[in-house]
Amino acid sequence: MKKIITLSTLLLCSLSLIACSNSEKTNEVKTEASSSVQEASSQESSSSQKQTEETQIVGSDDYGYVKIPKSWVHFKEVEGGDDIQYCDGTDVNIVTLNTFKPEQFGISESEYAALETVQISTSIYESKQKSQDFSKVWGSKSTIGGYEAYVVNCIAKNGKYLIIWVFKSDDGKFRYVSLEGVPEVLKNLLPMVEESWTNKKS
């Protein structure tokens, strides 16, 4: 996923997601991703649920931390850049952590501090809309680690979901967290990631 964005692109795009976030799309991630995911979950056995209770905390002080299943392993995508990524042993179900830096936007520290979260999320939103890989892309808002986040939700043509959280933590850093995979896996991971993200490992 390309995350290098120019400041001009951010500023030009900022209005579109503001409009999007004020629409009824706010509820779509609950009604679309969650309902698809919950449908799959209703057929899961109790032994499978027990397995998901065994977790690990992964990440770094730079990128933040999340809780994921203990069986997941660290890996690096070819185009992953400096992301921290973990998967379930396949290239389908993946969690990604990163933090946006001023140099990625070609701006100064003071310009970075003045950015709005919606400017960054809008650029991601529009790039996904233009991609031929996705059949549906929409924006919403949610909470991750206690922070309000703009969320870019995507459904790939192969049925795989991609959920991207963009938010500003209390240390002034713009954070990037993404979760991709199939509904039966996301049903456990989505709330786990949203509830567990933290910028310091406890």
Where are these regions (language model features)?
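N-terminal, intrinsically disordered, polar/charged segments of Gram-positive cell-envelope systems
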Residues: 6, 23-69
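Signature of long, low-cysteine stretches enriched in small and polar/charged residues
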Residues: 121-169
